[in-house]
Structures are given as structure tokens and as C-alpha cells.
A protein has these predicted regions:
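Conserved donor nucleotide-binding strand/loop of the catalytic core
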Residues: 330-341
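Conserved alpha/beta core of the MobA/IspD/sugar-nucleotide pyrophosphorylase nucleotidyltransferase superfamily
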Residues: 268, 272, 418, 422-462
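Conserved hydrophobic helix-helix packing surfaces used for dimerization/oligomerization
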Residues: 8, 270-272, 368
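Well-ordered secondary-structure scaffolds
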Residues: 2-267
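N-terminal glycine-rich phosphate-binding loop and ensuing alpha1 helix
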Residues: 4, 39, 268-320
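Acidic helix N-cap motif at the loop->helix transition within catalytic regions
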Residues: 321-328
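Conserved beta-loop-beta/alpha segment of the NTase-like Rossmann-fold superfamily
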Residues: 340-419
């Protein structure tokens, strides 16, 4: 099956965001971008943010145009171009309903993006945690890891020191010397010498700190603050670098495209099933309602699934509270009124429903992930990594593990569906795992993630 065009919202329209747009647009996806009313993009000749104050911006073979509303944005996309809309809070999410959101604002902190904002969410640069704020993070720091996709954790923290280009780092920057309005004295593409006045800010001169070509400069008339980056100088002094997407932007765009392709190829091909019908015999009461860090265990388990809107999610339970919580989170509830028959019944009920739904939708499942409610330390990023591993290892069983200990979640390839449907009594998939050790792939996790709550005393270590 060929790739299907997805709707992708890029928050931010600066030069790096434009590099990301270039990769995604070239791959055939439908792109829309947001920005603030007065963009502060230094490399504005290669940034779609320029469309905000010029109405249109052409970068290489792409054209972006300012859209004032939904109707204009849709018309621009229909014509094959990229709409840029002034929408700092990205309220357009409500009507655009993107498949993917890329936060490329590059504020060095998260300004409000949530992992539940779209089926797949990517954070660009520091300030995001994969599995908490977004599904993955793309590294933006120059060097060996530039453009890497991070599925667990964060990008390298901002140091405040720009990367080395042509042997220069701090010297490359042109910074405002005072608060006030900027009046450029050099334009993008000009060759300048160290000590030359390149701008006036707040009536104070700004001097070049090195020889080279002005690669970026803010537009005239913008209000700036002292110390703000208003331009940059490139020692390589090549005119074409001023009007083409940078190597850094392309590398970051490549990382985003890798992540998007990974999601695109796996979405809808796996189902997630939460087993929540147990009797909690050893616990002495309903352990799924036990509170860990201010939240009932069943609630935190359901909330993990909310981060994976690209996959159909099921909750097998016979409990009213859990049913209501699951339905409000968009999960399909599969009723199990006979939990005394053991975990095998929940496995079979959930798997049967998932297979039926997939067949009805014409998208046969490649695998199913089973999770449980009593692992309060399980991270969303672990579920994501298990799905990724399963996609790249067809025919395998993939589970979380630490050292010699393996545990939930477990993702079963479709070739094991028949064996799972043959389970009986209070026997889960461990028997099948033992018989198919050669087919097992382990996703390493921290030991705390594997801890399950069986007895009340376990709560003290959770």
C-alpha cells in the first residue's frame, strides 16, 4: 500500500520550521503553519514567517501565503501551496484536525503543546520530553546527533552558545545594543567587516564582530530588546547560503520526516488493549482504584492510551467506573462480566473485538499490544518504543524488560493470535512466551516500570 497524504500542522514558521516544511511538503503531505503577529525570524529570506508581513513567501520551490481564516487556508492548500496563519495558540487545531503536529517554535521550552493535541506529536529541540509532552523529540543541536529522533527523553539542553559555523560561534551573532526599533544598516547578502555598523537599535549602533556575509537580519521597524539576536554573519561568505535552506534545517527536517514516516507506516496497524477486569484477590480490595501519586491506577493506565490516537484502543472491564473513564478517553469498552474465569477470558474478548473491528475497517492488524492497570510507573514512551520495535521486527513478540526480567506491556504479532485465542483459565500469555523464546524482542526499561501492584504493601514502593 502506498503512503497516504497526511494533514500536518507546523507550529512556527521560522527558517528551521521552513526546513521541516520542505521535507514534509516534498513527501506529499498537506502542510499548514502558524506564527505570531510579528515574527522575529533572522534568516527571513528562507522562512515562511515572512508571509505574515509580506503576504507571500517563496522559498526554493515552495510558496507560502498568509491566510486570515479557515476558508483562505483551505483554498491555499487546495492550490498546492502552504498557508501561514497568525495563531499563537494554534486554535486552528480545532478545525484543521491534523494527523500530526510539529512544534517547531524553538522557544527552548514547551509553550503549551500536549501529547494529546493530535494522533502524533513531535517536539523540536529542548523543552520537550518524549512520552510526556509529545511522542518524540528531534535534536536541534549542531554536531553528531543533529536531527536524531528521540523516543524517550529530551534533546540536549540549550547552552546559549551557538554552534560552530566556519570556525566561528558567538561572533556570528548580531545582537541588539539597546531596547527600541531596529534600523538595519546592512541587508542580507552584504559583505561586512569586523567593526562595521550593521544596524541601529534604540538609537545605538550595532557592530559586526567578524568578517563575512550577512546571512540574516530582522525586518526594519521591529521592536527589539537589548541582547536579542537580530541577525547573523557567515564566514563562508557564499551568496547562495543566504537564499537556500541551511544544512541544519535540512537535517532537522530529515529527522522530523523520519518520525512522520514511522508513524505513517504503523498507524492503524496495531491495537492497544488494557486488561482491567481482575478481581484483585491478593490485594484484598479493588486495587485498580488504588491511588498512586494522586490518581487511581486505572485512570493513569487509560490516560497512557490517550497518547496513541493513531491506534484503536480497547479496555476490557466489567466495572462501571472504569467503563465511564475509558469511554470519555475515546477507548472502546469490551465488557467482561465473568472475571472469575481468569485473565484468558479478558485476553480473548479484547483480541476478538480488535480483530473484528480491523477486518470491518479493511485494515487487518499486524499486532496487538496488551497492557495492565497495575503498573503505575509505566511510561508512554515505553509503549511507543514497543510499537516501533514491533513494526521493524514483523513476526516477533515484543515486551518490556530489564536485565533478566520481562514484563508488560507485550505486543503480539498476528501470527500468535490463534494461540492467544486458545488460552484458558487464569493463564495469560506467559505460556506462549516460554514456548517462543526465539521470537522474543526486549525493549529495555527502568526496573520501576515493570513493578506491578499485587498487594497493598506494594503501594509503599510504587
Amino acid at each position: 500500500m502506498g503512503s497516504i497524504e497526511m494533514k500536518i500542522l507546523i507550529k512556527g514558521a521560522g527558517d528551521l520550521a521552513t526546513g521541516i516544511a520542505s521535507r514534509l511538503y516534498g513527501a506529499g503531505h498537506q502542510i499548514m503553519m502558524t506564527d505570531i503577529a510579528v515574527p522575529l525570524t533572522v534568516r527571513r529570506l528562507v522562512a515562511f514567517s515572512r508571509a505574515v508581513y509580506e503576504g507571500e513567501a517563496v522559498v526554493e520551490d515552495m510558496t507560502a501565503r498568509l491566510a486570515k481564516n479557515q476558508e483562505e487556508a483551505e483554498e491555499i492548500m487546495e492550490q498546492g501551496d502552504i498557508p501561514v496563519i497568525v495563531d499563537p495558540k494554534a486554535e486552528c487545531i480545532q478545525w484543521f484536525q491534523p494527523d500530526v503536529i510539529v512544534d517547531a517554535i524553538l522557544a527552548k521550552r514547551n509553550l503549551g503543546t500536549k501529547i494529546t493535541d493530535a494522533p502524533f506529536v513531535i517536539g523540536v529541540g529542548p523543552g520537550f520530553i518524549a512520552g510526556e509532552d509529545c511522542n518524540c523529540v528531534v535534536e536541534t543541536k549542531r554536531g553528531h546527533t543533529l536531527g536524531n529522533v528521540i523516543w524517550d527523553g529530551s534533546a540536549i539542553p540549550n547552552t546559549g552558545v551557538p554552534g560552530n559555523v566556519g570556525g566561528y560561534s558567538i561572533e556570528r551573532l548580531i545582537k541588539a545594543s539597546a531596547d527600541g526599533v531596529i534600523e538595519p544598516k546592512a541587508v542580507i547578502g552584504d559583505l561586512v567587516r569586523k567593526g562595521q555598523i550593521v544596524a541601529i537599535t534604540g538609537g545605538e549602533p550595532v557592530y559586526a564582530l567578524m568578517d563575512g556575509i550577512v546571512r540574516g537580519m530582522l525586518q526594519p521597524g521591529v521592536q527589539v530588546t537589548k541582547g536579542l539576536k537580530i541577525g547573523d554573519i557567515d564566514a563562508r561568505a557564499k551568496q547562495e547560503h543566504c537564499r537556500t535552506i541551511s544544512d541544519k534545517a535540512r537535517a532537522i527536517g530529515g529527522g522530523v520526516l523520519d518520525a512522520v514516516c514511522s508513524y505513517e507506516k504503523s498507524r492503524g496497524k496495531y491495537a492497544l488493549i488494557l486488561l482491567a477486569a481482575g478481581q484483585s484477590v491478593r490485594f484484598g480490595s479493588d486495587k485498580l482504584k488504588a491511588v498512586v501519586e494522586g490518581e487511581a491506577m486505572y485512570e493513569s493506565a487509560i490516560s497512557r492510551f490517550e497518547a496513541f490516537q493513531g491506534f484503536k484502543s480497547y479496555v476490557v472491564t466489567g466495572k462501571e467506573e472504569i467503563t465511564l473513564s475509558a469511554e470519555s478517553a475515546g477507548c472502546t469498552v469490551v465488557c467482561n462480566k465473568e472475571p472469575e474465569k481468569g485473565i484468558s477470558l479478558s485476553v480473548k474478548l479484547g483480541l476478538t473485538k480488535a480483530i473484528e473491528d480491523a477486518d470491518e475497517n479493511g485494515t487487518p492488524l499486524r499486532g496487538v499490544l496488551f497492557s495492565v492497570c497495575d503498573q503505575p510507573r509505566l511510561k508512554k514512551s515505553t509503549i511507543q518504543r514497543i510499537i516501533n520495535t514491533a513494526f521493524h521486527n514483523p513476526g516477533k513478540i515484543v515486551c518490556a524488560g530489564e536485565g533478566t526480567r520481562n514484563g508488560n506491556p507485550v505486543l503480539w504479532d498476528k501470527r500468535f493470535f490463534d494461540k492467544l485465542l486458545e488460552l484458558d483459565g487464569d493463564i495469560g500469555g506467559k505460556k506462549i512466551l516460554k514456548e517462543n523464546v526465539d521470537s522474543l524482542k526486549i525493549v529495555p526499561v527502568q526496573a520501576g516500570e515493570l513493578q506491578d501492584i499485587d498487594r497493598k504493601e506494594d503501594l509503599g514502593t510504587a
